[in-house]
């Protein structure tokens, strides 16, 4: 198992009436194919159909009878411009856009034994959690439940975890104590390249459309 600090990524939460219908105008993917607890990889488009960024969209289900919620994980280099673009497009449609990682951290556990380790830390059976599935988990010794998704950018199995800064430090140390290997950006880039995963700014940009990028 390797662990990555990916706190430079952006994480936004969209809330409002029919958030999928509103966000659908900016993405080529059919967001209605995913339901609560599921997610999909997609690309964020500009007004010409060029790719502004790639991202993962998580369906967090209904807040109440009239409102739903989505979580978006966007790339670090594009986070500010993505956030401004999404707000510009979503707020007139009545959605609120909140940066939910502002005071938190995002960690990735990756490798063939990563999910087994997460299962030990949570005390829950995660064997039924599919790729791109997500749920809240209470991990041993942490103060708050953790947004946990079976996603990653390495081509390996594993999970990405969103948690507050204090819990993030505790979890990082606990993982070190268990012998988990800390990994950096270079290792992550090599792994994603071996898995043929796109890198925004290198394999595609705002002048590339999804067809040209093979997406």
Label each residue range with its predicted role:
Residues 1-215:
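Basic, glycine/lysine-rich polyanion-binding surfaces/domains
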């Amino acid at each position: 198992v390797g662990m990555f600090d990916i706190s430079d990524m952006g994480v936004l939460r969209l809330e409002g009436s029919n958030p999928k219908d509103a966000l659908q105008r900016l993405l080529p993917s059919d967001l209605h194919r995913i339901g609560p607890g599921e997610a999909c990889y997609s690309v964020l488009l500009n007004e010409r159909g060029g790719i502004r960024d790639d991202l993962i969209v998580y369906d967090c289900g209904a807040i109440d009878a009239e409102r739903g919620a989505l979580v978006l994980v966007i790339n670090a280099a594009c986070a500010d411009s993505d956030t401004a673009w999404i707000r510009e497009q979503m707020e007139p449609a009545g959605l609120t856009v909140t940066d939910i990682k502002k005071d938190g951290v995002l960690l990735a556990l990756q490798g063939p034994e990563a999910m087994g380790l997460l299962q030990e830390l949570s005390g829950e059976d995660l064997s039924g959690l599919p790729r791109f599935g997500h749920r809240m988990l209470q991990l041993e010794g942490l103060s708050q439940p953790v947004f946990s998704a079976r996603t990653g950018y390495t081509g390996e199995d594993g999970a990405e975890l969103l948690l507050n800064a204090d819990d993030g430090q505790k979890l990082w140390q606990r993982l070190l104590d268990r012998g988990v290997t800390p990994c950096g950006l270079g290792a992550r880039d090599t792994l994603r390249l071996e898995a043929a995963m796109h890198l925004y700014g290198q394999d595609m940009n705002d002048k590339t459309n999804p067809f040209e990028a093979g997406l």
